[in-house]
Amino acid sequence: MAQISDSLDVAPESFSTETPNEEAPKAPRAVLNVSGGAVGRRKQAIARVRLVPGSGSITVNGREFADYFPNKLHQQLVNDPFKVLDLLGSYDVVARISGGGPSGQAGALRLGIARALNEIDEENNRAVLKKNGFLSRDARVKERKKAGLKKARKAPQFSKR
């Protein structure tokens, strides 16, 4: 019993509360001096995207990014591929988007940016982009209206008597 109490006195000194830093600090990714382009689609929106090495400015249909997408959620959605690859502020984006609403357009722009980044440096970027689901086209589209129904699935009111 005395042996256990002696080891209890020593135990707090031998253990550290600090966890060792397992991960070495990541070196910033090298920006290739290569431009790339791609097309992204989501719902009814189509985005034609061009990436050029630069300061990180995003221009959509000739307008500033924050003006075109005032919603912070849409801005975050579009910037996700850059954040995952540690390339935020490395490429200028010039995009032309047509069709759809704000959410579909943001999704189309995100897919276009991810595909363009994949095209620029496939061997380093593809695995990370694919793992995070940025290279997958979201195939969900609006279901068509059926004859005899008010909407795609909504039936007219039914009365038994």
Curated annotation (Swiss-Prot):
Pfam families linked to this entry: Ribosomal_S9
Alphabetized InterPro entries for the sequence: Ribosomal_Su5_D2-typ_SF, Ribosomal_uS9, Ribosomal_uS9_bac/plastid, Ribosomal_uS9_CS, Ribsml_uS5_D2-typ_fold_subgr
Record's keyword annotation contains Membrane: no
Keyword Ribonucleoprotein in annotation: yes
Location of the region described as Disordered in the Swiss-Prot/TrEMBL record: 1-27, 142-161
MF term (GO), any: RNA binding
Keywords carried by this UniProt record: Ribonucleoprotein, Ribosomal protein
GO biological process: translation
One GO cellular component, as annotated: small ribosomal subunit
Residue stretches spanning the membrane: none
Family as reported in the entry's similarity comment: Belongs to the universal ribosomal protein uS9 family.
UniProt xrefs under HAMAP family: Ribosomal_uS9_B
NCBIfam families: PRK00132.1
The protein's name in its UniProt record: Small ribosomal subunit protein uS9
Organism from which the protein derives: Clavibacter michiganensis subsp. michiganensis (strain NCPPB 382)
